[in-house]
C-alpha cells in the first residue's frame, strides 16, 4: 500500500536539508546538499539563488529514488528558510544579482540613514545590518543600474518556492524580517518604502500554511513527483525551528545553537516595549508572535575554539574536557563577539575577549569559558524578555547545545529554567513538514500536529545553588562590553 508523505525543505546558509515525513510524524528519509557562500569583500556574504534551486532539485531526486521512498507518494511540500536575505528579480522572474544574506554587514551607512528618519526601531524591530531594507538601499545606492530593473523582491525560501510553482508570495513570519512589514496589521508599510523610493516591488502576502500552488508539471516530471503535489508557503527558519521543536504556546521558549544562537519566546500578545536589539516577529502559528534575541557567534565560537586550539579533538571531547573544569572556568570569562554582536548590543565592531587569564588556567578552563560565554550571551536575551514581564515555563534546546548533557544542565543552571531535549531533532525542516501536513488537512490544527509529531526525550531542572554562582560571574560578564568597546574600536582602526 502506498503511503502519503510531505516534504519539509529547509534552506539554510551552509546547506539545504529535505525530509520526508509520514502521517505519524516519522522521518522516512532525509537528504542534505551543501551550498556555496560568496564572500568577495570584508563584510560581504552572498549566495547564488540558482544554486539553491539546483541543490533542491538534486536533493529531491536523491530522496525520491531512495529505497525508503519506494512505496511512498509526496502529497505536499513546504519550506523553511534563512531570513532577511534580499533576492531581487526582473519582470521575467530572473535574479538580477546574487542574494545578499542575513549575515552581510556592508550596509551600516544605510542603517544610519533609516535611523535618521525613524529612530532606533522600525515596525517593532531594531534597525540592524541583517534586515532586508538596508540591503535594498545599498543596492539602490551602489548598483542603480540593477535596482532600476527590479520587478519584485523576495526572501530566500520565497524564490525557491517560486522556482517550484512559478507563483510569487511572501508569508508573514518572514516578511516581518524586512523592516517593511507591520506585524500588527499584517500589511506592508508602503509609506516606509516610499520614503526611500523603493517602488512597487512588494510580493503578495499569505499565511504560513497557505496553499500557493502546485509543483509545475514539467518540474514534477523531472523530479519524479506526481502531478498534483501541493505547495504551502512555509516560514522563516526561526519560526519553523520553533514549530519543529514544539514551541508554539505562550511562555514556551526555544534555545537554538547553530552558527549563530537564538533565544525565542512565544507570545500571544504583541509587545512594543522591548529594547536592546530584541526582535518581535510573527510566528508561523496563526495569531501568535515571538520575541527573539540573537548571539551572532554561538556555534561559530566553538568552531573557532576547535580549529584554533583543539584541531585533533572532536566536539564531544572538547565538551567533556570543559566539563572537567569548575563552574566559572576557574575565574576565566569569554565574550563570544567574534563577529560583532546582535543582542543586546547591536554592535558590528565589537570583538571578543578572554578576561581573567592567569598562568594557572588550562585548556579545560578555556574550553569551559567559551561554552559558558556563549550561554551568558544567550542569557542576555532571556534577561531582556523577563524585564519586559515575559516569563518562561520551559525552554526547548536544539542544535549544538542539545548534543551534550553537560551543556544542557549548564543552560538550565544559568537560565534558571527547565530545559527540554527532544527525542528526535529535525529542526526547521520538521516545522516546514508540519505546515505542509496541516495545510493538506492531515490535522485540524497545528497544535494537534505538533502533539503527534514532537516528543520530549529528557528534562533538565536548574540547580539553585549553581545558578546563584553563575549570576555572580554573569554580573562581571555583563560589564565586559562597556569596558572593551572603545579598546576593540581602537584595535580595528589600527588593523584596518
UniProtKB/Swiss-Prot annotation:
It catalyses: D-xylulose + ATP = D-xylulose 5-phosphate + ADP + H(+). CDD domains: ASKHA_NBD_FGGY_EcXK-like (cd07808). The keyword DNA repair does not apply. The keyword Signal does not apply. GO terms for biological process: D-xylose metabolic process; xylulose catabolic process. Its EC number is 2.7.1.17. One of its GO terms (molecular function) is ATP binding. It is an enzyme of class 2 (transferase). Catalyzes the phosphorylation of D-xylulose to D-xylulose 5-phosphate. PANTHER family: SUGAR KINASE (PTHR43095), XYLULOSE KINASE (PTHR43095:SF5). This is Xylulose kinase. It comes from Staphylococcus epidermidis (strain ATCC 35984 / DSM 28319 / BCRC 17069 / CCUG 31568 / BM 3577 / RP62A).
